[in-house]
Swiss-Prot record:
This is 1,4-dihydroxy-2-naphthoyl-CoA hydrolase. Its EC number is 3.1.2.28. It comes from Synechococcus sp. (strain WH7803). Catalyzes the hydrolysis of 1,4-dihydroxy-2-naphthoyl-CoA (DHNA-CoA) to 1,4-dihydroxy-2-naphthoate (DHNA), a reaction involved in phylloquinone (vitamin K1) biosynthesis. It holds the Pfam family 4HBT_2. The active site is at residue 21. One of its GO terms (biological process) is phylloquinone biosynthetic process. It comes from the Bacteria.
Length: 153
């Protein structure tokens, strides 16, 4: 696992032509897709294999016992985002309770906020479909994200 969280909580995203609408600005639904992809990339950069978190991966002998469905998402658009823009993306994970967490995604263009996205996940048993504790791998990722960050008492 990587100790320096800036390598897995601070990412970049180049806006591609296919991400934009007829007006040449980012189509609204792309933001939540980017949020989820950034979370996946963050887990990967941190050192977690996709098979440890996501079902259906190639070569996976057994699916994870715990699923992490998205139960809430939100996006705020502050400024237009155009094709070719190189965005900085900062992730701030937060454990909400023993079975859920949320990731805040902050998108910046030239150090100016252009959008924010939030995605909330709840851990459920794949067998019973009832809430369960977060998987150990996600717990480690959440704990590591707190290192060097001041949190409220």
């Amino acid at each position: 696992m990587i100790a320096d969280s800036s390598s897995w909580l601070k990412l970049t995203k180049k806006v591609r032509f296919g991400d934009t609408d007829a007006a040449g600005v980012m189509h609204f639904h792309q933001l939540l897709r980017w949020c989820h992809e950034a979370w996946e990339e963050s887990l990967e950069r941190y050192g977690l294999e996709a098979q440890a978190v996501f079902p259906g991966c190639r070569g996976q002998e057994q699916w994870p016992a715990i699923a992490l469905p998205v139960v809430h998402c939100r996006a705020d658009f502050l400024r237009p985002v155009h094709g070719g823009d190189q965005l900085s993306l900062h992730l701030t994970p937060q454990r909400l309770d023993p079975s859920s967490f949320e990731v805040h995604h902050r998108f910046l263009l030239e150090q100016q906020d252009v959008a924010h996205g939030w995605i909330r996940h709840v851990a459920i048993s794949t067998e019973t479909r009832r809430r369960s504790a977060l998987p150990d791998a996600i717990e480690r990722w959440l704990e590591a994200s707190l290192i060097g960050r001041i949190s409220e008492l």
